[in-house]
């Protein structure tokens, strides 16, 4: 505990928080161009082929972003919108591609959580 005299001499320094998504540069989303679309395998207890894309952003960064949902239409040179949010079992993947915007199609035949996957309302 500092004394009052020590606090008068030098005031308390506020701790600076480190951002978890630096490539977004304090923006909610960023546009980018896919440079490579591929699959990656997750960390130890899990087993799958997760769909990911390497994206060059308008902020100048090149990041790895996860493609959520079943099936996608992305390929090299596709223009995508990314948001923050990591994938726990894929090391180095700290961003998600937003489905249903720009060149990314929404998930087909999706009935639940549609807004998260850019799916239109089903025809009754």
Swiss-Prot record:
Coiled-coil boundaries: none
Keywords tagged on the record: Methylation, Ribonucleoprotein, Ribosomal protein, RNA-binding, rRNA-binding, tRNA-binding
Annotated organism of origin: Synechococcus sp. (strain RCC307)
Chain positions covered by the region annotation Disordered: 9-28, 104-124
UniProt subunit comment: Part of the 30S ribosomal subunit. Contacts proteins S8 and S17. May interact with IF1 in the 30S initiation complex.
Function: With S4 and S5 plays an important role in translational accuracy.
GO biological process: translation
CDD domains reported for this sequence: Ribosomal_S12
Organism lineage string: Bacteria, Bacillati, Cyanobacteriota, Cyanophyceae, Synechococcales
Gene Ontology MF annotations: rRNA binding; structural constituent of ribosome; tRNA binding
Keyword Cell inner membrane among UniProt keywords: no
In-chain residues carrying the UniProt-annotated modification 3-methylthioaspartic acid: 89
Protein name: Small ribosomal subunit protein uS12
One GO term describing the cellular component: small ribosomal subunit
Domain of life: Bacteria
Family of the protein in this entry: Belongs to the universal ribosomal protein uS12 family.
